[in-house]
UniProtKB/Swiss-Prot annotation:
Keyword presence, S-adenosyl-L-methionine: no
UniProt topological domain (Cytoplasmic) ranges: 88-111, 158-169, 217-302, 355-368, 421-437, 490-500
Full protein name: Sodium/potassium/calcium exchanger 5
Linked pathology: Albinism, oculocutaneous, 6: A disorder characterized by a reduction or complete loss of melanin in the skin, hair and eyes. Patients show reduced or lacking pigmentation often accompanied by eye symptoms such as photophobia, strabismus, moderate to severe visual impairment, and nystagmus.
Record's catalysed reaction(s): Ca(2+)(out) + K(+)(out) + 4 Na(+)(in) = Ca(2+)(in) + K(+)(in) + 4 Na(+)(out)
Species, as recorded: Homo sapiens
Family the UniProt entry places it in: Belongs to the Ca(2+):cation antiporter (CaCA) (TC 2.A.19) family. SLC24A subfamily.
Amino acid sequence: MQTKGGQTWARRALLLGILWATAHLPLSGTSLPQRLPRATGNSTQCVISPSSEFPEGFFTRQERRDGGIIIYFLIIVYMFMAISIVCDEYFLPSLEIISESLGLSQDVAGTTFMAAGSSAPELVTAFLGVFITKGDIGISTILGSAIYNLLGICAACGLLSNTVSTLSCWPLFRDCAAYTISAAAVLGIIYDNQVYWYEGALLLLIYGLYVLVLCFDIKINQYIIKKCSPCCACLAKAMERSEQQPLMGWEDEGQPFIRRQSRTDSGIFYEDSGYSQLSISLHGLSQVSEDPPSVFNMPEADLKRIFWVLSLPIITLLFLTTPDCRKKFWKNYFVITFFMSAIWISAFTYILVWMVTITGETLEIPDTVMGLTLLAAGTSIPDTIASVLVARKGKGDMAMSNIVGSNVFDMLCLGIPWFIKTAFINGSAPAEVNSRGLTYITISLNISIIFLFLAVHFNGWKLDRKLGIVCLLSYLGLATLSVLYELGIIGNNKIRGCGG
C-alpha cells in the first residue's frame, strides 16, 4: 500500500514539476509579434479571440498584465492536477470494469474504452474547440500532444530508464502505420480550411478499421511474420521472442507482471485461480485490491503531505459526488462512476481551456501555440508517467505501444465533434478551421512518425538513452519550428486579434 501511495504522490509531484517548466516554454527567448495580420490568399483577416466565448474572468487585461496572470497559471496547474486525480482514481477503474463486463479482449478494450481514459482530456478539449471556442485549440492540442507522445515520451523513457529494453517490430510497425494513415487523413481534411461531414466520418471509419485489425491481430501478425521474416531480420527475431516468452511472468520479488508480448495500450488480465487480479492501465502498473486505502489517509512524508493538502478540495469533491468503484461496496455502480467522472473531466477541462485561452490572449500568444505547448504536454502527463514506469521494468514494447498506439484514438477525438457538428448541427455545412499552421504541424507529425520508426530500427530495436537523446533533440526542433511558424516569425502566417 505504501509503495502504491508513494508512486501516486510521486506521479503528481512529477506532474506539477513538468507543468511548471512547460508553462514558461512560449516565453523563453522569444520576441512576440504585436497583433499582426494573418495572410489568407490575397487578403488579410483578423482572428476573433476565443476568449469572447468564455465568461469575462475576474481580472481586467491590465490587471492580468500587472501580475494577476500568476493566478491564472496557478489555476491551470491545479486543473491539470484535478484531471489527473479524477482519471487515475475514478475514470480508468470504471472503464476497466466496463471492459470486463462486456468481455472485451485486451486489444479491443485497450483501443476503445481504455484509450478513452487516457484521451478524455483531449476529447473534451476537441469538443470545446469545435462547439464553444470555435477555434483551433482542440485541433492544435491533439496534434501537438501527438508529436509530444511520439518523440517527447520516447525521450523520457530512454533517458529516465536504467534498463535497455528490446523492442518487437510488428506492434511498432502496426501502430505507426495506423497513425500515419490517420495523420495523413487529417492533413487532407484541414488543408482547405473546411471540414465536411463525410471527412469527420472518414476519421471514425479509420479508427473502426484499426479496432478490426486488433481483433484479428494474432492471425495478421503470424501471417505477416511468415511472409516477411525471410527478408526482414527484425520480424524473424520477433517470432523467436514470441515463441520463447509467455504472456504472464513473475518478477524476482514474486510479483506477477505482464510480459512484453502484450502489445496494447492497456488491458485487463486475470491470473489463474488463487491469485489476485492484475490490471494494466494507461496510467501505469498497479496491483488492484478489493478495498483501496481511504483517500483521506494523510501521507507520512512531508512533501507528500503538501501535495495531499493542496489536492484535498478536489479529493473531497470527488469523494462526495462520485462512487469509488474500486471498493467492493461500490463496484456495481461503475456506470455512475463512469458518467460522473466524465462530467468532472469535462468541467475541469472547460476551466483549463478557459484559463489557457485568457492567458494566451494576455501574453498575445495565439491559442494554437498554447495548445502546442502547455495543453499538449499537460494532457500527456499520465501517458508519460505510465510509459516511463513500464520502461524501467524492461517492458519496452508496452511503453512504445502506449506512446504510439494511444495517438490513434486522438484522431477519434477530432472525428466525433467534427462529424456531429457538420452532420447534425450545421445542416451539412462545413466546419471552419482557421489555422494554416496546423497543416505544417500535421506534416511535421508524419515526418516524426517515420523518423521514430527509422530511429528505432537503426538503433538495433533497443529503447535506451541513445534513442532518448535523439528523440529529445528531434522533439525540441519540431516544437520550436511549429511555434515559430504559428507566431509568424517564419513563413507568412502572422496573426492579429480583431479589434486590436
